[in-house]
Amino acid sequence: MRDIYVIGSASIDLVVKSDRRPLKGETILGESFFMTTGGKGSNQAVSASRLGGKVRMVGAVGADDFGQQIIENLKENKVDVSNVESVTHVSSGTAHITLSEDDNSIIVVPGANFAVTTHQVEQVLNEAAEDAIVILQNEIPKDVILFIIDKCDELGLTTIYNPAPFIEIELDYLNKVTYFTPNETEVKELFGEDYEAIIKAYPNKMIVTLGDKGAVFYNDQLVNVPGIKADVVDTTGAGDTFNGALAVALSKNMALEDAILFANKAASISVTGLGAQGGMPYREVMTDV
């Protein structure tokens, strides 16, 4: 099995559940509050590990209680944390999440996630096996993201680039990644409303996720990989589950369409639990894929 490296954020999620979102200047009463581990990188690492991947996390946390919780959670989920650094000059990253109306909205405070450096990443990638898979997202500094893409391209490593949260990026970098996995909102921010032509321009590379409608990519023709309906409790982390699952499927040399179907299945299960990682499935429940 190929190694999976997740380079990215590891945070604590501070979650409020309410029946609606407040209007500007309004205070409302929430239904409940809880804290859980999160961050897109950490979520993707946990997703991949639970589904049977051999996963290493690369990132940074603060030297604080939150940082310790993040590390312990990764260890409990059998993720290698030897490349997660503890820094003293900034606190651990946090995400402030509102759950309402069967969806979520999130404000991210990067904290230690912005302490990830090109030097740290370069050391790790230089030691990676040539068939390793690298997952990255946009919750670490942009210069580090671009460095990772360039370095992986130089080393011939397989990359899954999940461009969330949205940042402006030169399109030349898309030619250097193996797989590019925006959701429908992100692809519209990058390319405008009519993005089907763009998908065709990146065959077997651009995979646009469409929530419960599944995902679409181009392979001689537009391929719609169906989603799976689920009883939604919390959509937080569904995209991260998808990307972690996609990496696992590819690490087992599944064909791309089958890998996306596997990832859709995992994402559909993830929304039935509370919290970004609460509903993430283990391999044994993925019996029909």
Tell me the role of every PLM-derived stretch.
Residues 4, 195-289:
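Conserved phosphate-binding/catalytic region of the ribokinase-like
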Residues 3, 132-133, 179:
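Structural motif
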Residues 1-60, 65-69, 76, 232, ...:
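Glycine-rich phosphate/adenosyl-contacting loop at the front of the ribokinase-like
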Residues 59, 136-138, 162:
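Glycine- and other small-residue-rich loops at beta-strand/loop junctions that grip anionic moieties
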Residues 149, 155-226:
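Conserved phosphate/ATP/ADP-binding segment of small-molecule kinases
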Residues 49-50, 153, 251:
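Gly/Ala-rich phosphate-binding loop of Rossmann-like dinucleotide-binding domains
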Residues 24-27, 35, 50-132, 287-289:
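Conserved N-terminal subdomain of the carbohydrate kinase-like
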